[in-house]
Amino acid sequence: MLGRLSPLRTPHSALRTALACGLWLAACSLPACSRPRTPQEWQPREFLIALRGAPPPKPPLYAQVAQAGFNAIADGVGSDALDLAHRYRLKVVLGQIGLDTATLSRPADARNVADAIRRFDSHPALWGYFVGDETLESQLADVAALADFARRHDPMHPVFISLLPCDAWVGPALATGDYADYLERFIRAARPALLNFGHFPFREKGDSEFYFENLELIRRAALEHGLPFYPTLQAASWPGMRPPTEGEMRWLAYTALAYGAKGVVWFRYWGAPAGSRQGIVEPDGLLTERYRIVADLNADLRALGPVLLPLRPVAVYHTGPTPVGATRLPIHGLLGALEGGPFVVGEFEDAGGAKHLLVVNRDAARAVTVKLAINRPCKGLAWFDPSARAWAAQAVEVDRFQSVAEFSLPPGGGRLLRLGKATR
């Protein structure tokens, strides 16, 4: 889908329609599509908090987007949204300028698209260019050519390409039998500056068991290639998908952070059928209960994002029953024990080598008290308080061998800890 999501179509229904109609893209034969020889120059400077399902570009609607704590619209909006987005300090992923194979196959039209890119590349609201949604492996050559075209004419802004989840109904393998291979082929072909995917786990007929596996595979690919990744998080219901609870939406956000996400994209903000209460905002402007939930979570993300953005992901571990594709907390690691429920723990380092731990309650329905033992005596254990946007001292008991801390977490919530220097 290039452009705004229609009210009755989801990413997976659009894919089914495309396959049913045989809308496979032809192999690339675009003019001026030779691969650029310069490296990708774009690097993320802020933590992305974006939406899919863009509202019409009207002042009251964009004001609502900004008030909910978003800083970007990642939905291939038209150029008419740029000035309005800038008014509300929003960035946009630009679409609707002809960045598609059919248009670029005509030399005159390709020149017009290049002119459009040059016209908008210095706009302060421009975040990047929308190129592909739920990309099939058979589309990689086309998507790569589109990405090259955009990158040649504007190397300072990334292309936004959404990838399929590992359990897509066409098969996790798509054409190869291996989702990791699908990711590798995509990265080699398109040379993206970022990875985006959507794995929507909350389903009417049983939740997905492959959510953490998908996060892990994306995480590995992102680390191997030095790319940030931005998962699309489920904030709505549609046929086959149930509405997530507040705890589940918090769980989505914090588990993504634990795995090293450098931003998130909430779906679906706008475009659900009127009266369905399936999205965040209805077509008549009615705010559903999920608007307040997302706004609260975005406030946390705006506070945590600048702290997490420069940290280097080191490892991710689980306690309790280990989900598919996850790694169990080792017995003899940095953490000696983690009690109180099932948890996800993301381990990070800053530029100076200081260890950080993001501890996430894997129970999305129940608040828990965490008892955490660090296998070294730590001087100055601290936690980051999103409401104060500051580090605070974490109460801790220290002996010769361990540091033990206790704290509470809401359903699906997390706490970022910074370990001080060892005292021995």
Feature map (PLM): residue ranges:
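Glycan-processing catalytic domains of CAZymes
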Residues: 34-379, 385-421
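Short, basic, low-complexity termini and linkers enriched in Ser/Thr/Gly/Pro
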Residues: 1, 6-17, 23-27, 423-424
